């Protein structure tokens, strides 16, 4: 983090959610596959899943006393037919702002 220094590394934290597709979304996505274009229903589902997993990870970091998470990574996997997991993880840390450097009066 620019302007900050990691003073303590706490632990790996994670969050996940498992979501299933909706039959109505599947039908619309199937039609969209024929004509092409963005599958907005799935884009929205993925965004909701990402936010939920992130909030769970942040809550775990806060329980440890962290004020930042570094090295965040996302992963997805199929759990069952029609159900997928979105998994996010990172390292919970404590950061502090760097002390401002005072100008050297002898070396302008």
Curated annotation (Swiss-Prot):
Q: Name one Pfam family in it.
A: YbjQ_1
**Domain of life of the organism encoding this protein:** Bacteria
Name of this chain's protein: UPF0145 protein ACIAD2946
Q: Which InterPro entries match?
A: UPF0145_dom_sf, UPF0145_YbjQ-like
Coiled coil (UniProt feature): none
Q: Family assignment?
A: Belongs to the UPF0145 family.
